[in-house]
């Protein structure tokens, strides 16, 4: 995932919420219904996902997160997040194209 990979999140609905235990979360829902579940992320990870507009490399995303929160996420963590979003069809790319084709 290192290099010129520029993750591009699809338009999703996002809602702030409070999880059991009182922790703030952001709930993401796919309005196209390709990913039928909801995705719960902590606000910091949700911020990182919001930066995935297709214009930023993985390293750009890491630096954007660092500027916002003062912590540099590990490459492995970020690669895993991107892989997870991709596998769910939440990023524009090959998996989304396949899943969208199956839905038609």
Each language-model region and where it sits:
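Long, low-complexity, charged/polar intrinsically disordered regions in eukaryotic proteins
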Residues: 1-34
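Long, charge-rich, low-complexity alpha-helical segments
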Residues: 32-104
């Amino acid at each position: 995932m290192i290099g010129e990979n520029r993750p591009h999140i699809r338009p999703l609905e996002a809602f702030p919420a409070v999880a059991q235990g009182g922790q703030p979360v952001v709930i993401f829902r796919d309005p196209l219904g390709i990913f039928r579940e909801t995705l719960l992320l902590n606000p910091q990870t949700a911020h990182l996902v919001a930066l995935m507009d297709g214009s930023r490399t993985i390293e750009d995303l890491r630096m954007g997160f660092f500027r916002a929160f003062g912590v540099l996420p590990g490459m492995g963590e970020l690669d895993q997040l991107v892989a997870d979003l991709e596998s769910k069809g939440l990023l524009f790319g090959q998996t989304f194209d396949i899943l969208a084709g199956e839905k038609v």
